[in-house]
A protein has these predicted regions:
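Formylglycine-dependent sulfatase
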Residues: 239, 248, 275-276, 286, ...
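Short amphipathic alpha-helix adjacent to the substrate-entry channel of hydrolases
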Residues: 85-104, 336-345
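Alpha/beta-hydrolase active-site loop
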Residues: 115-136, 277-280, 391-397
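Short beta-strand/loop motif that positions the catalytic acidic residue
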Residues: 224-226, 230
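C-terminal catalytic histidine-bearing segment of alpha/beta-hydrolase fold enzymes
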Residues: 55, 235, 239-303
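Primarily recognizes the serine-hydrolase "nucleophile elbow" in alpha/beta-hydrolase
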Residues: 126-202, 206-207, 211, 438-439
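Short beta-strand element of the alpha/beta-hydrolase
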Residues: 67-78, 314
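N-terminal cap/lid segment of alpha/beta-hydrolase-fold proteins
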Residues: 25-67, 486
C-alpha cells in the first residue's frame, strides 16, 4: 500500500507539468448552467459535447495550498437515466463541517446524453482521477479520497473502486489512479448479473461492470446502507457482498434498515433514516481515521427541513429491583407477578444486556444524570449519606439541565441520594448527621435537584432520611416510610395531569423508593404474593408503574412520550435472597450475584422502552448498553451535540430503538462494585479485577484471598453467561487487552471521543485486592 501511495503522489506531481490547472478561479457560468448556486464549480472533463461539472464543498477556513484533507466524490442516483447532482448536497455540507472536502459530480446519463452504464462508470473514474490529479491545489489528501453514491450512483462509485477497465482514454491525466480509497454506498445496484439490476443493459459484459462479480483483496473499505424492503437490491445480495468482502480481508460495514424501501436514505423519504445514515457514515469515516472528534448533530439538525420532534420522557427507576424480579425477563425462575411491567415490555423494546453504571445506588444515579462514571469523582466506593455538599459539581451539565435548556419542563419525583445540605430553618446553619437523625420541617436545601436542572422536586434523599419529605428546596413534612411509594405514585400522576394542560414537553424522572429497604408494602398488598414481604413490595411497585403508565395514556401522551423502566442495580441481600430461592424465585434470573457485586446480578438490570408507533412492540435488543448512556441518547434524540465537558462515558442507544446497530468508538463498558472493584466488558468478554464478588456475595474479597483465588477473572459471556468458568489463565492475552483498554478509559478522563477531560481525583486504584504476578 505504501508503494501505491508513493506512486500516486509522484504521478500527481508530474500531472502539474503536463496538465493545465483548472482551479485558479471557478469557471464563470450563467445561472442556468449552475445546478448549485454559490458553490465553486469546475469542469472535470468534456465528453459527448458536454462539459461535466464537479461542485466543491470546503470546510470553513480551508487553505488548499497548505492543507491536505480527506475528500469524497458523490454520484447521484437515477437508474443511469437521470438524476440531480444535488442529491447529496446536505451530505456534502455536513462532511465539510467535519473537515472534509466534498465533491458532487455530474456524469452522463441516458435521458440527457443518450449514453449507457459504461459511460457512467467512465465518468465516475474520470471525476475521481481529476480530484486526485489536482489534490495539491484542492487541499486534498490523494490517499484519502472516497467515492459515494445512491442507487445507480452507488454502482458508479462501487465500480470505480472495484471494477477494472472503463477508463476514459481521453483523460489528460490517465496515468493517475481513479481508484477511491473508501466506498460510501447508499442502496447501490452493485449486482448487475442475470439476477441483479440492469442486466439487460449490460448483458454482454456484465462480469466486467458488476462490482459484485469483481471482489478482490485490493478493494477499498466499504460502507453500505440498504432498506429491508428494497425491491431493486435484495438483502441477500447485500449480505453476500458484505461476506465476500470480509472473506478476502476487506473492511466492510453493512446496515440494513427494517421496513425501508429503495431510496430511504433521502431526507424527503425518511428524515430519521437520513440522519442515522449520515451519523453512521461519520462513524465509519472516523473508524478509518479520516475524521476526528464526535459527530456534529447540532449542525446536522440545522440542515433538516423539518426539525426533530420533542417527545416527553418518563424514566421510572426502581431501587434494588433484580433482573429476575421482572416476570417476563425470568419466566422460568421468577415467581413474582409483574403484569404491568410485563405489559410495558410487550408494548415496546426489551434490552437484554443493559447495565447500571455501578452495582450500588449513588454511583448509578450520578452516572445516569451526568453521563459520567461516579468513580471519576472523589467517591471511590460505597454511597453518600446526605448532610453534605452535592456530589454533582455546580458547573457539570446534567440530563435535566440539558433538557431544560432545550425548552423542557423537568421534574424529579422520588429518591435523590447524591447529597445535599440541610440548613436550619431558624439560624441558616448547616445541619449535620451527628446531631440530626432527621432534618426538621422547614429546613432548606440549596444544592439539591433544583440546583442541577430540575424545575420541580418532590421526594427524599435516601432510605435513612425517607421520613423527611422535601419539595423543591424545603422539608415540608415528616411522614412514615410506608406512605412513600403511594405518595410518589400520586405526585407523578398529578404532575402528568398538570402537564396535559400545556404543550411544553416534559422530562419526568421517577426514582422509586422500592423495593429497597425498608420493605414496607401497604396493608392491601401484604400477603398478595404468597411468597414474602419483599415479593409483596415488588407487586405493589409493579402496580405503581401501571398507574403511572395509565396516567400517561389517559392524558393524551401515549404517542409522544418515551417511557423507560429500569433499576439502579441488582436485588439486595435484604430481600432474603436464599429464602426466595428456596421458594423457586431467583432474583437475578440465571445470573450470578446480586446488588453490590461485579458479577452480572449486581449490575445487569431490566431496561424496557415504550415509544408508541416508533419502537416496535415485543421487540428485543441484545446490544450492550449502560445507564450512563441516557444523556447521549437524549442529545441524539434532539439532534444536539453533547455539551462540552459533559457525558464523557455516554453513548447514544437511540439507533437500537430503531432496530439499528449502536455506533460508537467506545470499546467497552466499565463496571464497578460497592467496594470500588473494577470490571470491563468488551463484546463477549468480561474482565473482573477481583478475586471474588467484589461485593456482598460469597466469596467476598477477604475470603477469596484466603482461598488463594486468582487476582482477576475472565469470562466469555456468550458461552458462559452464568460466570461459572474463569478462563483468565487460558486467555491471558484477552485479559491483557481488556485491562489495557480499561486503564486507557480511566486515565483519559472519558471512555468516548470528545473534548479532552480529566478525572476529579488521582486516587483511582485499579487493583483493590492486589494485582496478579506478573501484572497484566
Amino acid at each position: 500500500m505504501r508503494t501505491i501511495n508513493i506512486l500516486i503522489s509522484f504521478a500527481i506531481v508530474l500531472t502539474f507539468y503536463i496538465a493545465p490547472s483548472l482551479l485558479a478561479e471557478p469557471r464563470k457560468q450563467s445561472a442556468a448552467d449552475v445546478a448549485i448556486p454559490d458553490i465553486p464549480v469546475d469542469v472535470y472533463k468534456h465528453a459527448s459535447g458536454h462539459g461535466l461539472q464537479i461542485y466543491r464543498f470546503e470546510p470553513a477556513g480551508h487553505e488548499p495550498l497548505t492543507e491536505q484533507r480527506p475528500a469524497a466524490v458523490f454520484f447521484f442516483g437515477g437508474g443511469w437515466n437521470g438524476g440531480s447532482v444535488r442529491q447529496f448536497e446536505k451530505h456534502a455540507k455536513y462532511l465539510a463541517s467535519r473537515g472534509m472536502v466534498i465533491f458532487l459530480a455530474d456524469y452522463r446519463v441516458k435521458k440527457k446524453h443518450g449514453t449507457d452504464p459504461d459511460a457512467c462508470v467512465q465518468d465516475g473514474k474520470s471525476a475521481i482521477r481529476w480530484v486526485r490529479a489536482n489534490a495539491s491545489q484542492l487541499g486534498v489528501d490523494p490517499n484519502k479520497i472516497a467515492a459515494g453514491g445512491g442507487s445507480a450512483g452507488g454502482h458508479v462509485a462501487a465500480a470505480a473502486g472495484i471494477c477494472n477497465g472503463f477508463e476514459d482514454p481521453t483523460d489528460s491525466n490517465i496515468e493517475i489512479s481513479s481508484k477511491p480509497n473508501a466506498l460510501l454506498l447508499f442502496n447501490p445496484v452493485y449486482d448487475n448479473g442475470p439476477e441483479g439490476y440492469g442486466y439487460s443493459r449490460v448483458i454482454e459484459h456484465f462480469p466486467a461492470i458488476s462490482p459484485a462479480h469483481n471482489i478482490t483483496s485490493d478493494d477499498p473499505p466499504t460502507l453500505v446502507f440498504l432498506g429491508s424492503k428494497d425491491k431493486l437490491v435484495p438483502v441477500s445480495t447485500a449480505q453476500k457482498f458484505d461476506t465476500d468482502l470480509k472473506r478476502v480481508g476487506v473492511h466492510s460495514a453493512l446496515h440494513v434498515y427494517s421496513g425501508q424501501p429503495h431510496g430511504f436514505f433521502n431526507e424527503s423519504k425518511s428524515p430519521r433514516c437520513f440522519v442515522d445514515t449520515i451519523l453512521k457514515m461519520d462513524h465509519f469515516l472516523t473508524s478509518l481515521g479520516w475524521l476526528r472528534g464526535p459527530p456534529k448533530r447540532t449542525f446536522l439538525c440545522e440542515l433538516l427541513e423539518e426539525k426533530p420532534s420533542r417527545p416527553n420522557v418518563v424514566l421510572i427507576m426502581c431501587d434494588d429491583l433484580g433482573y429476575g424480579d421482572v416476570h417476563c425477563l425470568n419466566p422460568h425462575q421468577g415467581k413474582i407477578k409483574t403484569p404491568h411491567i410485563d405489559a410495558l415490555a410487550a408494548a415496546g423494546m426489551t434490552f437484554t444486556d443493559a447495565h447500571s453504571g455501578s452495582a450500588v445506588c449513588t454511583p448509578t444515579r450520578y452516572g445516569l444524570l451526568t453521563g459520567r462514571h461516579c468513580w471519576r469523582t472523589k467517591l471511590q466506593h460505597g454511597v453518600v449519606q446526605g448532610f453534605a455538599p452535592c456530589l454533582i459539581a455546580d458547573d457539570r451539565p446534567t440530563v435535566a439541565s440539558f433538557l431544560k435548556a432545550k425548552g423542557y419542563k423537568t421534574a424529579l419525583i422520588g429518591k435523590w441520594h447524591l447529597n445535599y445540605q440541610y440548613q436550619d430553618p431558624e439560624t441558616g446553619a448547616f445541619l449535620n448527621r451527628k446531631n440530626h437523625s432527621l432534618p426538621p420541617v422547614g429546613a432548606e436545601i440549596s444544592d439539591g435537584p433544583l440546583a442541577h436542572g430540575f424545575d420541580f422536586f418532590h421526594g427524599f434523599h435516601h432510605s435513612r432520611d425517607m421520613d423527611a419529605i422535601v419539595e423543591d428546596t424545603h422539608v415540608i413534612e415528616h411522614d412514615d416510610a410506608i406512605t412513600m411509594l403511594p405518595r410518589l405514585a400520586d405526585q407523578s400522576i398529578r404532575y402528568i395531569e398538570k402537564a396535559a394542560k400545556n404543550k411544553t414537553p416534559f422530562f419526568l424522572y421517577i426514582p422509586l423508593s422500592s423495593p429497597h429497604t425498608p420493605i414496607v408494602p401497604s396493608e392491601e398488598w401484604l400477603g398478595k404474593s404468597g411468597i414474602s414481604d419483599y415479593a409483596d413490595f415488588v407487586m405493589q411497585t409493579d402496580d405503581v408503574v401501571g398507574q403511572i403508565i395509565q396516567a400517561v395514556d389517559t392524558n393524551g401522551f401515549a404517542e409522544n412520550t418515551i417511557i423507560i423502566f429500569t433499576s439502579d442495580n441488582g436485588c439486595s441481600k435484604a430481600a432474603n435472597i436464599d429464602e426466595l430461592k428456596q421458594k423457586g424465585h431467583h432474583v437475578s434470573g440465571i445470573y450470578r450475584g446480586s446488588k453490590a457485586d461485579l458479577w452480572e446480578g449486581g449490575h445487569r438490570v431490566p431496561f424496557l422502552v415504550r415509544w408508541t408507533n416508533t419502537v416496535k412492540q415485543k421487540s428485543y435488543s441484545n446490544q450492550t448498553i449502560c445507564l450512563t448512556d441516557f444523556f447521549a441518547t437524549l442529545t441524539d434524540l434532539l439532534l444536539n451535540d453533547i455539551p462540552p465537558l459533559a457525558a464523557e462515558d455516554s453513548v447514544s442507544f437511540l439507533p437500537a430503538l430503531y432496530d439499528q446497530s449502536i455506533v460508537t468508538e467506545r470499546k467497552g463498558i466499565i463496571h464497578s462494585s460497592i467496594s470500588g472493584h473494577f470490571g470491563y466488558r468488551m463484546n463477549a468478554w468480561k474482565l473482573l479485577l477481583a478475586r471474588g464478588s467484589g461485593g456482598w456475595t460469597s466469596p467476598k474479597e477477604g475470603a477469596a484471598k484466603q482461598q488463594q483465588l486468582p487476582a482477576y477473572q475472565l469470562y466469555n459471556m456468550t458461552t458462559d453467561p452464568t460466570e461459572s468458568n474463569n478462563v483468565g489463565s487460558e486467555h491471558r492475552d484477552i485479559a491483557h487487552e481488556l485491562y489495557t483498554r480499561l486503564r486507557t478509559d480511566i486515565d483519559a478522563g472519558r471512555s468516548t471521543i470528545g473534548t479532552a477531560s480529566a478525572n476529579d481525583t488521582t486516587a483511582i486504584k485499579l487493583w483493590k485486592s492486589g494485582p496478579p504476578t506478573p501484572e497484566l
